[in-house]
C-alpha cells in the first residue's frame, strides 16, 4: 500500500456500525461507559495525560487520585491486600503465572477456561492440566476434581502444580462454580487459586478473602464500564507473600515493578475506570435484580423452544442457548444461517454472532426489562414468521 | 476504605489539571489527539466496541478496517514485513525479548536505554550488557562499541547475545545514534537489532528496511497521537524468520498468537490510532520543520545561559538542558527548587517536572513557532525577574 492521499482516506474517523443498537453480546454489556466515563474519556484522551503529575510510579499518582483508587478503593472492592492495574484480565493472569511459576511447571485450569488462560499459560511455558466438567446440559465442575488433578500432577511430575485457576463464571455458559470449596481443596495441597473474574468483577459482588482465593483477575473493558484495554489484578496474601513476588521491584530501577514493566494502563483507560467506579460499585449491589432479569429472560425464551444450558435457575447474565427451532429454520430459508443475525439486526438488536443459530450466547446485563421484553418479542416474531 | 457514598465521591469524573496549558513534556507532545481521534474516542469508547464484528482475530477485523491498517498501511509506514498492535513500546520490546531469547541469554542495550527496556529484559530473565556512551555534553554512542559488547558477551558466556537494542532517539538527550551502522555491526555477529522508536515512529520518518534493523517498537500514546496504552511492533524478516517466532500461534487455539495473548489493544486506543494515522503520516513528512523549530528554540535558550546537551545541532524535538543560572536562582529564592515550575505554571506552561532547575528535558514537537516564542520569552522574563 502506497500511503498517498487516496489510501489514507481509508482511515481517519470511522463510525461504529452498531451504534445505538441494543447490544446483547456478552463482551459488550458490562463495558458500556457511564456518563462520567464518557466525559473522562474526552478529558483524559491524550496519550500520556495521566502522567502530568507522576513522580515515577503510576499507582502512586495523587492527582488525579490514582493512589487512593488502587491502594484503598480497589482492595476494599475486591477483598484483597494489594491491587494493580493491568492491560486486562489475560495480562493479569499471565503476570501471576509468569511470576509465581517456573517454566515447565503445571497450572490447573477448569475445563471451561477461556482461551486466554490457556494462551497465558503457554506464553509462560507452563504445562496445562484441565479439570473436567460434566457434559451437556449442566457443564458442572466438581470441586473435588481439582484435588484429583493436583494429585495426578504430583504423581506424574513429582511436583505440585504452581497454580490453579477457575473461571468465575466461565465465558460460555455463565456458570458460577463453587469457588470457595475449590479454593479450600487447592489449599489442602498448598496450591494457590486464581479466580478469573472477567465476567464478574464489576457486575456482581466478588470478595477474594470471603471466597478464600489468592488472586483475582478482572476486566475493565468487559465488566467495569471502562474504555479498554484495562484490567485489575488483586492479590490476597493470606496464604503466602504473593504480592512480594508478583510486584517485585527491579534491582536496578528501584521503583519499577518488573512484572508490570514499570507501568501499565494509563490515561483514558484508567480514568474511565475511576470515573465509572462509583456506579460500578453500586450496580454490583443491584446484582439480585440482574439475576432476576436473566432468569425471566431465560424462561421466556424456553417457552419458545430454546433451551438454556448451564446452571438452572441461572445465576448470571451470561447465558448459552441451544435453539433447535432456529437451526431448523436456517436449513431452509434463503439467507441460511445468517437469517437470525439479519432479522435481529433489522430490529436494532446486535450481539449474537453472525451465522449462529443452533447454539449462541448472549448477556442480559443492564439491558433492562423493557429492552429484554422487546428482544423476547422479537424472537417470538422471528420464529412465527418462519414457522 | 469503606465504599460508602462519601468515599465514592473521590472518584467519578475528574478534571485534568493541565488542560489548555502549553505542554512541553516530552511524554505529551506526540500523544495529543487529532480532531478525528477525539471523535473516534467518543464513538469507540465502550469497552470492547471494536469486537462487534470480530471473527476471532483482532488484526483481521475488516469492519472497521483493522486488517487493512495493520497488514497494509502500518508495514508500509514502518518499512517492515509484519506488524502487530501491542499495549505500548515496552510491551513490544518484552514480546520480542521473550519470544526470541531463552532465559539467561544476554541482551545488549545502549547505555542510554529507557528504563522500560531494562525492566523488559529483567522480566524476560535475560542478562543485560550495556554499550557505553561518551560523557557530557555529547552522550555519543559509537557503533563499534556494539561489536565490542557482543564480543565480550561471547568470550564471557560462550554464546552470542540473543538481541541488541538501540533507543532511537534516547529519551533523555534526544540523540539519534547511527542505527544503520549499528545494525550492520550487529549483523556481522548475526545478532538481530531492535530499535526502540517510542520517540520517533509517528514523529519522524523511520524505515526498518532502510536502516537494516530487524524489529521496531513504537508507541501510540507517546508519538502517534493515540489514546494510550497502545504501541506497534514491526518485524523485518530480511535476516531471519522472526515473525514466525514472535507471532507463533497457539497449538490448541490455532488462530491465537501466544506472545500477544490472543489480542492486545482494542477499541478506543486502536481506533484513535487509526483516526490519527492520516495526519500522523503527513506530520512525519514535515519533520524537517520540526527539527528547525527545535534548533531555533535551543539556540534561543542558549543565548540566555542554558546549555543544550546531546547532539548539536540537534536532530530531534526532545532536548535536555543544563541551566546553571536557574539552579543558582533556586538556591536563594523563597520557593526554592519549585520556583521554575511555578513561574512557568503561572504562564500556562506545563511539562518541566516540578522541582527541576539544574537539568531538565522538554520537547518542542508540534508546539509551533508562536508558542515556542512565548516560552522563550517566558524563560527570559523569569531569569531577568530573579537576576
Swiss-Prot record, chains A, B:
It catalyses: O-phospho-L-seryl-tRNA(Cys) + hydrogen sulfide + H(+) = L-cysteinyl-tRNA(Cys) + phosphate. GO terms for biological process: translation. Homodimer. Interacts with SepRS. The lineage of its organism: Archaea, Methanobacteriati, Methanobacteriota, Stenosarchaea group, Methanomicrobia. It comes from the Archaea. Disulfide bonds: none annotated. NCBIfam families: PRK09331.1, SepCysS. This is O-phospho-L-seryl-tRNA:Cys-tRNA synthase 2. Keywords: Protein biosynthesis, Pyridoxal phosphate, Transferase. Belongs to the SepCysS family. Converts O-phospho-L-seryl-tRNA(Cys) (Sep-tRNA(Cys)) to L-cysteinyl-tRNA(Cys) (Cys-tRNA(Cys)). One of its GO terms (molecular function) is Sep-tRNA:Cys-tRNA synthase activity. It comes from Methanococcoides burtonii (strain DSM 6242 / NBRC 107633 / OCM 468 / ACE-M). Its EC number is 2.5.1.73. The keyword Lipid biosynthesis does not apply. The keyword Transferase applies. Pyridoxal 5'-phosphate binds at residues 89-90, 196, 219-221. The modification N6-(pyridoxal phosphate)lysine is found at residue 222. Its cofactor is pyridoxal 5'-phosphate.
